[in-house]
């Protein structure tokens, strides 16, 4: 059974007694910084010169420094930049400004798990990873609630890393909902697997194949879109509320029976074997090496795959349909970069 921590398990005064630098002011960065500040913690923001986030952070009342200056000032350095830029940011601006007794905080274990970042002697390495986007982390905190968090300690150089990680998690509101104890390895490998095999890669491919199957059989693209993509939210919401059992309880008997007899025909044992291969590539570092090598080369594979995905017929159909509904009219205008949700 997982070990779960709550507010009563943490001493907020620990993080209140630290100077915290949040490196990055995107979705997670703004939530961590604002929640910590509202919990009585002294926080500065570290950003590169010319960052588009600087005006936002300053408008929110934060002092903005360079990443190097912020790291030098702080006792606790929170790295919330995208995975692919963390190691360069760390090497160029952060590492030389760390000293014994400091702590590095991560929101995801990628760079530690795969060895792209290595902390110097005497520096704690901890993780607090909210299981929700930053705007939800902030909204729930303001409402007196919290988003569950994953907490881990990779390196306890000071002997006080666990009290610190729990105090930090309490400071952002995570222990109101609960903090699940894990390791950097478990968080990284399961997170990447979930994204690739189910939540992003698996679902995206399933939806595209479903759309193609219907349209190639002569059905209208608009009808196909509703059946395989639009209604997915209704099903996922039910699963989120009460698991697969509630989803099956809520749908018609026809849909439930079709679930049992046709689901295994589509997602058969061969899919599970493919999932195992995906997990193996994550565990042995194959995926990480491929991703970082592509990013270092300017992301040619990544960008080509993005363009290919955007050109799938389901995207044009979706844009056409979403314009018809007032409650959905602006949903195609509220994102720009792939990192917006992180």
Swiss-Prot record:
Keyword Ligase: no
Sequence positions that bind NADP(+): 25-28, 48, 51, 53, 83-86, 134
Keywords noted in UniProt: Amino-acid biosynthesis, Branched-chain amino acid biosynthesis, Magnesium, Metal-binding, NADP, Oxidoreductase
Pathway recorded for this protein: Amino-acid biosynthesis; L-isoleucine biosynthesis; L-isoleucine from 2-oxobutanoate: step 2/4; Amino-acid biosynthesis; L-valine biosynthesis; L-valine from pyruvate: step 2/4
Residues the entry annotates as binding substrate: 252
Residues annotated as binding Mg(2+) 1: 191, 195
Any GO MF annotation of the entry: ketol-acid reductoisomerase activity
Stored InterPro entries: 6-PGluconate_DH-like_C_sf, KARI, KARI_C, KARI_N, KARI_prok, NAD(P)-bd_dom_sf
Span of domain KARI N-terminal Rossmann: 2-182
Membrane-spanning parts: none
Positions of the catalytic residues: 108
Cofactor: binding details: Binds 2 magnesium ions per subunit.
Domain KARI C-terminal knotted: 183-328
EC numbers on record: 1.1.1.86
Co-factor requirement: Mg(2+)
Catalysed transformations (reactions): (2R)-2,3-dihydroxy-3-methylbutanoate + NADP(+) = (2S)-2-acetolactate + NADPH + H(+); (2R,3R)-2,3-dihydroxy-3-methylpentanoate + NADP(+) = (S)-2-ethyl-2-hydroxy-3-oxobutanoate + NADPH + H(+)
Any one Gene Ontology cellular component term annotated for this protein: cytosol
Pfam families cross-referenced by the UniProt entry: KARI_C, KARI_N
Domain of life: Bacteria
Residues that hold Mg(2+) 2 according to the record: 191, 227, 231
GO process terms (BP): isoleucine biosynthetic process; L-valine biosynthetic process
Function, as annotated: Involved in the biosynthesis of branched-chain amino acids (BCAA). Catalyzes an alkyl-migration followed by a ketol-acid reduction of (S)-2-acetolactate (S2AL) to yield (R)-2,3-dihydroxy-isovalerate. In the isomerase reaction, S2AL is rearranged via a Mg-dependent methyl migration to produce 3-hydroxy-3-methyl-2-ketobutyrate (HMKB). In the reductase reaction, this 2-ketoacid undergoes a metal-dependent reduction by NADPH to yield (R)-2,3-dihydroxy-isovalerate.
Family note: Belongs to the ketol-acid reductoisomerase family.
Stated name of the protein: Ketol-acid reductoisomerase (NADP(+))
Source species of the chain: Leifsonia xyli subsp. xyli (strain CTCB07)
């Amino acid at each position: 059974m997982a070990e779960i921590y709550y507010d009563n398990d943490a001493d907020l005064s620990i993080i209140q007694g630290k100077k915290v630098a949040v490196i990055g002011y995107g979705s997670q960065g703004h939530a961590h910084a604002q929640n910590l500040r509202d919990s009585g913690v002294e926080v500065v923001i570290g950003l590169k010169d010319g960052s588009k986030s600087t005006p936002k952070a300053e408008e929110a009342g934060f002092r903005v420094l360079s990443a190097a200056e912020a790291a030098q000032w702080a006792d606790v350095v929170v790295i919330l930049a995208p995975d692919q830029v963390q190691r360069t940011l760390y090497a160029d601006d952060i590492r030389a400004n760390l000293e014994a007794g400091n702590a590095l905080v991560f929101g995801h274990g990628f760079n530690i798990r795969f060895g792209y970042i290595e902390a110097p002697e005497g520096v704690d390495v901890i993780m607090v990873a909210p299981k929700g986007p930053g705007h939800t982390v902030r909204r729930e905190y303001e409402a007196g609630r919290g988003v569950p968090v994953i907490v881990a300690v990779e390196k306890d150089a000071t002997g006080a890393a666990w009290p610190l990680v729990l105090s930090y998690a309490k400071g952002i509101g995570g222990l109101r909902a609960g903090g699940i104890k894990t390791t950097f390895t478990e968080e990284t490998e399961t997170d990447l697997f979930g994204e690739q095999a189910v939540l992003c890669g698996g679902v995206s491919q399933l939806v595209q194949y479903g759309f193609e199957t219907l349209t190639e059989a002569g059905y209208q693209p608009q009808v196909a879109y509703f059946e395989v993509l639009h209604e997915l939210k209704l099903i996922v919401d039910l699963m989120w509320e009460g698991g697969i059992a509630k989803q099956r309880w809520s749908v018609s008997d026809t849909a439930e029976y079709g679930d049992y007899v046709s689901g295994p025909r589509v997602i058969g044992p061969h899919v599970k074997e493919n999932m195992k291969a995906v997990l193996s590539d994550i565990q042995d570092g194959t995926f990480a090496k491929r991703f970082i090598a592509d990013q270092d080369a300017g992301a040619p594979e990544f960008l080509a795959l993005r363009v290919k995905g955007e050109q799938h017929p389901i995207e044009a159909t979706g844009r056409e349909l979403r314009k018809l509904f007032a409650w959905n009219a602006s949903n195609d205008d509220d994102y720009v970069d792939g990192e917006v949700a992180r």
